[in-house]
């Protein structure tokens, strides 16, 4: 059974999703004279030649990504169609994160963090409308733990550096009857000594099929997700109904689940959930053409294989919850700079064969500040 605080996180997702959906439906009823085609934003069906490719649901590298695939040059966000059901992110991003030392619970030590990360996703051949798309993906992350703390059960020192190095492909194929079929395969290593042994290798495999619903406005999303470095290291099927009652509201009802509501041209409110306890809630407000203010709550889980672990199936989990505020600035040519200040809490590090049971070497550390800066290119 999941610990009570994890059940609370899932309750937060449920409550926020209900509030957003209720508000969106109430707003659409109050504006009853408008049909879906007449509501904001205009021209929602712009064809995206480079659709969303980010499937990194649980190993998100220490900084927020907008759930909306907004183009900083456009006056309005665009509706997403035809990509993976697993979300969206910038094709190129790089940045860093820093959290000053805080006290380790039960040990005479402190623990500080800093991280650097980069990601790129690019089409391998020039994309063409209505044609299959092949996308190459590369990801890199380095997390440094500055501490004298030890893993209490094994009495081993805390790893000082953890690495994520992955590369792979995404394929998206339009179907003649509408909808898309595709998948992603990523291969690499997530470890304190990457590629040191075969047991330290990891992969992420995703298959998805999106098909239009009977009303031709909505979609059914079917998917299968597997990664040994996930909170649920087993194949996880997904079924979701993408409900679009208006151009201002889109909700994916099922697994993975999400909702995005744009009450006007300045505000975007969103929430997303993926098992087991991956929750993200975000509010974003445009401040003119170049600036945006954002605030979010989310959980963050980093998962690695320690090279010297005694049990092959054991993983190292680095977990926290965080609330953040920040600013985005569009600097031209599709580039955006994002600066965030976060409050990190419920912070822990532990080993286990899965996320909810069989834990060893559990280390908790005090809440504290986190600062991040990243550069994104959104095409």
Which role does the model predict for each range below?
Residues 36-213, 217, 303, 311-324, ...:
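Transmembrane beta-barrel domains of bacterial outer-membrane proteins
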Residues 97-101, 139-145, 188-192, 227-231, ...:
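Structural signature of outer-membrane beta-barrel domains
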Residues 238-242, 325-335, 341, 362-379:
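Outer-membrane beta-barrel "beta-signal"
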């Amino acid at each position: 059974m999941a610990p009570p605080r994890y059940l609370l996180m899932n309750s937060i997702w449920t409550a926020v999703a209900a509030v957003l959906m209720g508000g969106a439906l109430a707003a659409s009823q109050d504006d009853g004279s408008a049909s879906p085609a007449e509501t904001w934003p205009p021209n929602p069906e712009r064809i995206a030649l480079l659709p969303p490719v980010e499937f990194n649901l649980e190993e998100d590298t220490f900084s927020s990504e907008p759930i909306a695939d907004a183009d900083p040059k456009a006056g309005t966000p665009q509706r997403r169609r035809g990509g993976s059901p697993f979300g969206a992110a910038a094709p190129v991003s790089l940045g860093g994160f820093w959290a000053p030392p805080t006290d380790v619970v039960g040990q005479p030590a402190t623990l500080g963090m800093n991280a650097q990360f980069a990601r790129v996703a690019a089409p391998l051949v020039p994309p063409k409308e209505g044609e299959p798309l092949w996308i190459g993906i590369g990801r890199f992350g380095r997390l440094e733990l500055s501490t004298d703390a030890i893993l209490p059960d094994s009495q081993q020192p805390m790893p000082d550096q953890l690495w994520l190095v992955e590369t792979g492909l995404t394929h998206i194929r339009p179907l003649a009857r509408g909808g898309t079929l595709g998948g992603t395969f990523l291969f690499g290593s997530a470890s304190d000594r990457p590629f040191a042994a075969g047991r330290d290798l990891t992969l992420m495999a995703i298959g998805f099929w999106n098909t239009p619903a009977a009303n031709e406005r909505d979609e059914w999303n079917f998917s299968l997700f597997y990664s040994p470095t996930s909170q649920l290291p087993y194949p996880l099927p997904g079924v979701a109904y993408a409900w679009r009652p208006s151009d201002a509201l889109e909700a994916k009802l099922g697994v993975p689940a999400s909702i995005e509501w744009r009450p006007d041209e300045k505000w975007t409110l969103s929430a997303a959930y993926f098992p087991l306890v991956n929750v993200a809630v975000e509010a974003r407000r445009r401040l003119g053409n170049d600036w945006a203010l954002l605030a979010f709550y989310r959980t963050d889980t980093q998962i690695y294989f320690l090279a010297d672990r005694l049990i092959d199936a054991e993983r190292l989990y680095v977990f926290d919850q965080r609330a953040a505020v920040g600013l985005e600035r569009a600097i031209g040519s599709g580039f955006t700079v994002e600066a965030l200040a976060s409050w990190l809490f419920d912070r822990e590090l532990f080993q286990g064969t899965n996320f909810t049971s069989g834990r060893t070497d559990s280390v908790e550390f005090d809440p504290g500040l986190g600062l991040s800066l990243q550069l994104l290119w959104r095409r």
